[in-house]
């Protein structure tokens, strides 16, 4: 079961929490949900080069608070805050609520699964050898304290006639252990031969207490640390 489902969804309410944090009545729920989807689409399109890890949306009374987790906060903010004001106006066109933007720096992008997946996808688009891109990402993650990492690349890798899946793993990635802090990210590389999918799982240790905010708090404090013995599985 743990190998089939999204590891973040499996741990919601245990050591992970939702990226949209608000409550609404049945008449408003659909409208606010569509607003969230549009806000995420606009931000991901405008900030494609900013290394966006995730976007958290909270809705206090008549307000819309958006936290953008990024590896390059300077790109998001812009010169003298010009870009962030532009983003605030764009979001203001989507929602009637008062918009507040908060930029959160990702201190260790090498152990953020979404950023690692996007980085590998960009390398595949630049025709970097997929094995080299995967191994480089694995080595960087393990060097910065990850307990384990697994990377899957699927598609016409290297321009092959037949699509296949290649994977590389180092350390422990206990997907069945609910107390394990597993980060998961996906990205799509649009190559000349077609699309290639990239999936990344990163194990950052165990969270023993029942705390849905524990994983996010650990990331904000920069205290990501792996646990357990390391095992290497080198395919190619």
UniProtKB/Swiss-Prot annotation:
The keyword RNA-binding applies. HAMAP family: Ribosomal_uS3_B. Belongs to the universal ribosomal protein uS3 family. The keyword rRNA-binding applies. It comes from the Bacteria. CDD domains: KH-II_30S_S3. This is Small ribosomal subunit protein uS3. Binds the lower part of the 30S subunit head. Binds mRNA in the 70S ribosome, positioning it for translation. One of its GO terms (biological process) is translation. It comes from Parvibaculum lavamentivorans (strain DS-1 / DSM 13023 / NCIMB 13966). The lineage of its organism: Bacteria, Pseudomonadati, Pseudomonadota, Alphaproteobacteria, Hyphomicrobiales. Gene3D superfamilies: 3.30.300.20, Ribosomal protein S3, C-terminal domain. Disulfide bonds: none annotated. Residues 214-236 are annotated as: Disordered. One of its GO terms (molecular function) is rRNA binding. Residues 39-107 form the KH type-2 domain. Part of the 30S ribosomal subunit. Forms a tight complex with proteins S10 and S14. NCBIfam families: rpsC_bact (TIGR01009). Keywords: Ribonucleoprotein, Ribosomal protein, RNA-binding, rRNA-binding. Pfam families: KH_2 (PF07650), Ribosomal_S3_C (PF00189). One of its GO terms (cellular component) is cytosolic small ribosomal subunit.
């Amino acid at each position: 079961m743990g190998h089939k489902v999204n590891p973040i969804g499996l741990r919601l309410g245990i050591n992970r929490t939702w990226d949209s944090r608000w409550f609404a009545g049945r008449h408003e729920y659909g409208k606010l949900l569509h607003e969230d989807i549009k806000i995420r689409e606009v931000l991901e399109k405008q900030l494609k080069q900013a290394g966006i890890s995730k976007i958290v949306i909270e809705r206090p009374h008549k307000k819309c608070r958006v936290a953008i987790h990024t590896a390059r906060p300077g790109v998001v903010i812009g010169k003298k805050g010009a870009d962030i004001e532009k983003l605030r106006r764009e979001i203001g066109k989507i929602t009637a609520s008062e918009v507040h933007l908060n930029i959160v720096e990702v201190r260790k992008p090498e152990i953020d699964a979404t950023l690692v997946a996007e980085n590998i996808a960009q390398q595949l688009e630049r025709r970097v050898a997929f094995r080299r891109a995967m191994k480089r990402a694995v080595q960087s993650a393990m060097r910065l304290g990850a307990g384990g990492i697994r990377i899957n690349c699927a598609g016409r890798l290297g321009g092959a006639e037949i699509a296949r899946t290649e994977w590389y793993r180092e350390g422990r990635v206990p997907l069945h252990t609910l107390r394990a802090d597993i980060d998961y990210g996906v990205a799509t590389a649009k190559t000349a031969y077609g699309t290639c999918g990239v999936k990344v799982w990163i194990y950052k240790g165990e969270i023993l207490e029942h705390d849905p905010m524990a994983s996010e708090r650990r990331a904000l404090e920069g205290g990501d640390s792996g646990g357990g013995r390391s095992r290497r599985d080198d395919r190619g």
